[in-house]
């Protein structure tokens, strides 16, 4: 059977519990039609690049699906009807990715960095050592 990666965006107003219920509902549709959901990832609330139906943020959810194309058609039909889902995208892939997705790896990488992009190590002036004497002081002591 073909493999699909399916991402849907739920309204920002929806609670995390409602998004979980949407995910369970979609998973039920997939399994009811003979498919299988191999991975489910919730990426949380993220900012959108542009407004979609007056929303600036949305809950992002990824599903990896193993099943025929009729499942994808039914899932997308259900999502068009649902008012809480503002956008969805399904892509057919040759094989499903094992482990965390690129977005989850990026979130882990962002947590390891500070606001300037460097590692979270050291403190104030930790690597520089003490100051060198200024040129004025050394030339003044030589002239005397």
Curated annotation (Swiss-Prot):
Please list the residue ranges that the record marks as compositionally biased, kind Basic and acidic residues.
105-137
Q: What CDD domains does the record point to?
A: bS6 (cd00473)
A single GO molecular function, which one? small ribosomal subunit rRNA binding
> Which SUPFAM superfamilies does this chain map to?
Ribosomal protein S6
One Gene Ontology term of the biological-process aspect is: translation
Region listing for Disordered, in residue ranges: 97-144
Q: Which UniProt keywords apply?
A: Ribonucleoprotein, Ribosomal protein, RNA-binding, rRNA-binding
- An example Gene Ontology CC term for this record: cytosolic small ribosomal subunit
Task: Please describe what this protein does.
Answer: Binds together with bS18 to 16S ribosomal RNA.
Which family, according to UniProt? Belongs to the bacterial ribosomal protein bS6 family.
The record, for PANTHER family, names: MITOCHONDRIAL 28S RIBOSOMAL PROTEIN S6, SMALL RIBOSOMAL SUBUNIT PROTEIN BS6M
Q: What is this protein called?
A: Small ribosomal subunit protein bS6
Q: Which organism is it from?
A: Afipia carboxidovorans (strain ATCC 49405 / DSM 1227 / KCTC 32145 / OM5)
